[in-house]
Amino acid sequence: MKNLTPLSLVVVLALVIMSSSCEKQASSEASTTEVVTEKTSTYSETKNAYFGDLHIHTSWSFDAFIYNVRTTPDDAYNYVKGLAIDHVSGKPIQLGRPLDFMAVTDHAEYMGVMMQMIDPDSRLATSEMAKRITSPERDTSRRAFGEIGFSISRNEPFPELLQKDIMKDVWQEIIDAADRHYEPGKFTTFAGYEWTSSPGVRTANPPFARNMHRNVIYRHTDRVSEIPFSSFDSQDPEDLWKWMDHERSKGIDLFAIPHNQNMSDGLMYDLKGMVSGKALDNTYATSRLRNEPIHEVSQIKGTSMTHPVLSPNDEFADFEIYPFTFVASGLPPASQPDGSYVRQALKRGLAMQDDLGANPFKFGFIGSSDGHNSAGPVEEDNYFGKLGNIDMLPEFRIAEENVVLNRVRMSAGGLAGVWANENTRDAIFDGLQNRETFATSGPRIQVRFFGGWGIDKDLLSAPDWLTKSYSQAVPMGTDMKPGKGAPSFIIWAVKDAESANLDRIQVIKLWKGADGKSQERVFDVTWSGDRQVQNGKLPSVGNTVDIASASYTNTIGSVKLSTVWTDPTFDPSQDAAYYLRVLEIPTPRWSTHDAHTLDIAPPSDPPKIIQERAWSSPIWYNSK
């Protein structure tokens, strides 16, 4: 993101579980991490922006291990803190700048089992499966890997690999790693894991699996579940929520973050139960609302905000679309857009909240990486792939013949942004749970968004505008109650200091019409330069990208954009939701950087340039 100037069966099987019996008791092993009870030196009443990654896999995830990843949770934390770590390519990888918070989220299914099978001190090393995994016969080991992968999507686990005491020890090691790297006021870590539900459609040709994955994040490390609830316990998210409610009743604070909605084939935001197929009711709505306050909307396997089919009048809807399901062989079938994207879900929530008595699709936004190298490759000019040796080199990633995994279609990943008083577990967790969050496609763009009534249009020029914003309006992620006239919104964004300038800020408005149907509209509200709206459209900001050198210049765009905007179409009788989209000027995509490295022309698809972006969480207006 720096400002630059002048396969095989194994491949197929990892797709099934890529992401992307449990006793319900608190862990008996208490963390030694000290509870922070005093404010840190970075404490701010008007809150600071913190950037993090809540979706990272290590060798303790099956689908990382099979591609030769051998790095650990400690490596993952070191990488995010700015240190170099080993990469399967043989070259070290290093993040350009440290992040502020992170969680290792290895798959709950067979968590750490693969590493145990190659550990001579583990009893799993003598298992029949371990002998096959470590067999010098390549076909034997591949078949073994395949059987393990299929057992996850089919929900038919190998009993010999589900030994509770081993799983408990591995889980405790993940918790301990989080504690080792927690530095209150400087760097925050969370215990977490991925629940990897991928219900399949076996009758299809070819059979495929649909993504229902969630990452589960814990507030504390001394109050966590004994072992994770996995998709082997249930593939139904509603059962996950019931389990989470039970854990919460024991003083364990946690929430789940859905991701890769784009690969759910319409299940993630279905109008009926995702697995049960039952009609939605108030219990469903309140349970989902309680357990899933934020959704991951941008990551390596694509952006789940919206799709051109669903938003045909949005010129920026076609951004990093990865429209596939998981497949057993060949080219993955397309994931149907209907029910698979966030904007449509927000609209559906507005339409159904009166009937259900609650809005099940009321959530904030974050991004994350889903990197499987103990690292997220979120920088376009520092991209090293997602999944071990399958995409470890540029020539592997952008080969024209690439079909399985569609590696060239993968994004560089996203980041989670949160506004919090300080960089501690409690403060960051509160910010996430309260939905005062924003997502980015990788750059560290900061976004502020407040909504209220009777806001002075000159408020942003006041030195204490932030204090006034919090006192006179509500921040992103919350509700506006009815007021006089039309609502006004305080809108502010500043560029990433090491990335591209800003093109524009847009307000995306969603509302429930008089006919009960939900609608959408995109407003350009502030932009760089002296462009004028022509025939209802703002002209392009321009383009400084040089494809041959994979470079651009910041000679266009703005460092900061801000405004107070009043909705000119407001109808007080209509429920509505508003969120921001902040666009950078065009920059080279990672695949263009790879092509430059190889001294070849970039692939014809996907686009050679992109406009990186950030999205605020919504603000809702309820007419009643």
Regions found by a protein language model. Give the residues of each.
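Conserved, charged catalytic cores of large soluble enzymes
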Residues: 222, 232-238, 320
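Ser/Thr/Asn(+Pro)-rich, low-complexity disordered segments
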Residues: 136, 207, 228, 275-277
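Long, charge-dense tracts
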Residues: 217-219
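C-terminal motif of bacterial Sec signal peptides marking the signal peptidase cleavage site
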Residues: 18-21
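C-terminal functional module detector
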Residues: 23-73, 77, 84-126, 130-132, ...
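Bacterial N-terminal signal peptides that target proteins for export
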Residues: 1-9
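Aromatic- and acidic-residue-enriched carbohydrate-binding clefts of CAZyme catalytic domains
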Residues: 126-157
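Active-site gating/metal-coordination segments in enzymes
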Residues: 154, 222-225
